[in-house]
């Protein structure tokens, strides 16, 4: 049975806030939680949630994870709290540090998250920013590990916008030595600084590829992953993106070009007929709802690691 080790970094703002060993330990711990082989009571600790963006899976999975750990959750609505009236982040962070034991924040600007971490005296977790979605990536790689065991056998192809999800997949791929391919239209590549950070870690620089033809990108791949084309806050770009991403739908034709053991991932919500066909979404090779369940287990493990 795996026991939680205190994470060396007090915060989890980026996938790179963990070492490779810590990342693997969190996955192992998550599997123990999933199989109900471990029970940890963090002495009625309190998790504060600050979500500037809509959320279903992240919000609920954090609340359930904290409850299963024996703690409680306080959900701060930015509209009805003083945050919505413009209270400085440094003031909010210092006050919440006296009420809560850990804070999970979903916001637009990554710099705002870093400002919370700067002024907070308790752990801060990135529950999604425009730059990264590291908790999602933890669940993604737990799902991949459950399917393929050895990460060295994995070729992960992400098809779609080079967004926060793609950025976190790249960083985690670098930590674990996984081949990651990002298939996107020109002009929608992942963040350059993220790519450069990943290349500093990758022992084999050729394991990270940016490809503009989705059919080339899926050759030999055994994980096909997609996300919405228009992220939250990009609703005004939807029409343009729908045109630009034509041909980047994961459908049966694309799946046939991948490995025979390929699985399908999607971080949800999904728009059938856009980034993924309804047929593939509901197919036997889809692991989408297993992936969604794993959000709960990895976040329970993450909270245990930060609070232990």
Curated annotation (Swiss-Prot):
Question: Which Gene Ontology cellular component terms are annotated?
Answer: cytoplasm
Superkingdom field: Bacteria
Protein residues bound to carbamoyl phosphate:
55-58, 82, 106, 133-136, 267-268, 295
GO MF term set: amino acid binding; ornithine carbamoyltransferase activity
Name the InterPro entries for this protein. Asp/Orn_carbamoyltranf_P-bd, Asp/Orn_carbamoylTrfase, Asp/Orn_carbamoylTrfase_sf, Asp_carbamoyltransf_Asp/Orn-bd, Orn/put_carbamltrans, OTCase_ArgI
Pathway-wise, it operates in:
Amino-acid biosynthesis; L-arginine biosynthesis; L-arginine from L-ornithine and carbamoyl phosphate: step 1/3
Query: Which UniProt keywords are listed?
Result: Amino-acid biosynthesis, Arginine biosynthesis, Cytoplasm, Transferase
Q: Which PROSITE patterns match?
A: CARBAMOYLTRANSFERASE (PS00097)
User: What SUPFAM superfamilies does its record include?
Assistant: Aspartate/ornithine carbamoyltransferase
Q: Which GO terms describe its biological process?
A: arginine biosynthetic process via ornithine; citrulline biosynthetic process; L-arginine biosynthetic process
Cellular compartment(s): Cytoplasm
Report the catalytic activity: carbamoyl phosphate + L-ornithine = L-citrulline + phosphate + H(+)
Give one Pfam hit by family name.
OTCace
Question: Where, in this chain's numbering, is L-ornithine bound?
Answer: 164, 227, 231-232
> What EC number(s) has UniProt assigned to this enzyme?
2.1.3.3
Q: What family does the entry list?
A: Belongs to the aspartate/ornithine carbamoyltransferase superfamily. OTCase family.
This molecule's function is given as: Reversibly catalyzes the transfer of the carbamoyl group from carbamoyl phosphate (CP) to the N(epsilon) atom of ornithine (ORN) to produce L-citrulline.
Q: Which PANTHER family match?
A: ORNITHINE CARBAMOYLTRANSFERASE, MITOCHONDRIAL (PTHR45753), ORNITHINE TRANSCARBAMYLASE, MITOCHONDRIAL (PTHR45753:SF3)
Would you tell me the protein name for this molecule? Ornithine carbamoyltransferase
The organism's lineage is: Bacteria, Bacillati, Cyanobacteriota, Cyanophyceae, Synechococcales
């Amino acid at each position: 049975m795996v026991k939680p080790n205190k994470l060396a970094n007090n915060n989890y703002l980026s996938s790179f806030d963990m070492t490779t060993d810590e990342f693997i330990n969190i996955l192992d711990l998550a599997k123990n939680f999933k199989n109900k082989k471990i029970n940890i009571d963090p002495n009625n600790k309190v998790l504060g949630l600050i979500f500037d963006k809509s959320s279903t899976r992240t919000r609920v999975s954090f609340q359930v994870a904290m409850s299963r750990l024996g703690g409680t959750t306080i959900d701060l609505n930015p509209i009805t709290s003083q945050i919505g009236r413009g209270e400085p982040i440094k003031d909010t962070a210092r006050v919440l540090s006296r009420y809560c034991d850990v804070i999970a924040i979903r916001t637009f600007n990554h710099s705002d998250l870093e400002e919370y971490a700067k002024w907070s005296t308790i752990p801060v977790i990135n529950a999604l920013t425009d730059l990264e979605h590291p908790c999602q990536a933890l669940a993604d790689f737990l799902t991949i590990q459950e399917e393929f065991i050895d990460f060295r056998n994995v070729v992960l192809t992400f098809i779609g916008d080079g967004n926060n999800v793609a950025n976190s997949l790249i960083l985690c791929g670098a930590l674990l030595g996984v081949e990651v391919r990002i298939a996107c239209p020109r002009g929608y590549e992942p963040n350059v600084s993220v790519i450069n950070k990943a290349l500093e870690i990758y022992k084999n620089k050729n394991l990270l590829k940016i490809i503009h033809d989705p059919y080339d990108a899926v050759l030999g791949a055994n994980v096909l992953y997609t996300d919405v084309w228009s992220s939250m806050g990009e609703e005004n770009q939807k029409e343009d993106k729908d045109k630009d991403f034509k041909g980047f739908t994961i459908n049966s034709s694309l799946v046939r070009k991948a490995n025979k053991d390929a699985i399908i991932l999607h971080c949800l919500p999904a728009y059938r007929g856009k980034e993924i066909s309804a047929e593939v979404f509901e197919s036997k090779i889809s692991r989408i709802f297993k992936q969604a369940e794993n959000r709960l287990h990895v976040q329970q493990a993450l909270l245990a690691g930060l609070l232990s």
